[in-house]
């Protein structure tokens, strides 16, 4: 009987708790904020009970979920992160006997449980995203359950949390240059093959691949013409990828990760020969294409400047000779044993430039721009079992005479070029347009408007107010990191005019034409660009070592007896230390660090500065500032000081 009674109690416990809950809610102090790893979430769990309950527990769980959709019906996903804590009650289960003990309880009414939980960090944390084929989401789940029967959850609620994992693109700061050489089929003797076909069709193919170490490999195949076309379509152009300061070179097909051309594509009339730039023969009729990127990593909202150099063996012109496209490639995995993936390509933006090769130069350098949108998804390759996001800058060189170029909506080339010309101009801020103030980028990288002279001021609040308004509105948007060398409004206007974001040229269709070559460069799209840390101690050593030279030129600033330096001189010393070679000063760093003593500024470094630590300022507590106490506590003290009522008899 005792066992049946206990069983009846455990079965009725979840239903009884479910009826006792009137409302359960999780609220964050800042619900619309975007949190990063190691940030602290502050909030509270609100529980409204209809009646008294005993042996209960309130649990808070931080959950990370991923979902993906392969094909039309195959959906999969799961929880890749789950960290929980108990806000009320015991974490363990309760061992019950015949007489059920009471370990805790909550009375009828509203109960608030404040919490603070730190966002996890590491490789298992990913940014929150949502797109057509999947999502990564985070939630805070509050659960009200019984200690006696933990599986019987009476109430639970979720609230969404936005997580942004910083992707620093500073380590992708090397210059990227890719070069391809295109040899003419008709003039190149190395590609001529004797054929027994009476119709004059090409029955053989020889491809010479020269790598950076000077070795070459030649292959000869006797196959049909359709097989040659299929072979050439799959390896249209071989790319050479090199980065300044890097010793490794990678060789891949220009359409290796982006394009999967069909077998019926036309034959390109240029066979690609990858070369290291040293064995190019000037007598050969070749076309050389160089594409240069100043960085391989860019932040959302930045411009991507491209420098494209085309060397031709004869004069040539095409109104759409160079087409640069920022491409996003999403790969969705199936999760099956065969490891099949669906590839989705999306053109983000595009720039069309004319190609003009004059007879006297036989080469042309084109400078064009692409722009990374602010709301774009950052690069993600940390979830290959579900989906990945990669970005490429694809440059297509149109060497054909045909103007059969169409957009995705089947609009001709004339419509695309006319739309590019009639694009709305960039809105110039009022400070630059009406007041005609020259804007520039200062040494700190900020977009600023110089302060006008007092003679031009009409009133005390006229130009100053508009200048401050410009600084507050556009100072963070237009900075040196975003512009990448665009230091005036004219260059920004040109960059904006050449970029197309909708109804772009169908590059996949264009590359199926004859005499069209293309290459792609993988780029990293992030959301952060950190600057290198400046060692202030080395900066001061460099300044002290150059002090005699500056005094001899009469450019030194007078300092006070305490060693303080004006702010203008600090900026000048910093500029000089960047421009001049500081190798000699850094080599003697170990010797000079012990001789500095009191020569450094007191605000810049403590007296016992160590070599491995950056100098930090010292602060003392302000004894004149008192923190105000709680109003209820002050009211309690005030009432306590009053005289008490006389006792009543």
Curated annotation (Swiss-Prot):
The residue ranges flagged as biased composition, category Polar residues, are: 205-217, 251-262, 453-466
Q: What does this protein do?
A: Required for the proteolytic cleavage of the transcription factor RIM101 in response to alkaline ambient pH.
Q: Which GO terms describe its cellular component?
A: cytoplasmic side of plasma membrane; cytosol
Similarity remark = Belongs to the arrestin family. PalF/RIM8 subfamily.
**Name used for this protein in its record:** pH-response regulator protein palF/RIM8
Offer an example of a GO molecular function term for this protein.
protein-macromolecule adaptor activity
A single Pfam family it belongs to is: Arrestin_C
Q: Which Gene3D superfamilies match?
A: 2.60.40.640
- Per the record, the gene is RIM8
Q: Say which species the protein is native to.
A: Candida glabrata (strain ATCC 2001 / BCRC 20586 / JCM 3761 / NBRC 0622 / NRRL Y-65 / CBS 138)
Please list where the region (Disordered) is annotated.
187-225, 239-262, 446-466
SMART domains with a match to the protein in the record: Arrestin_C
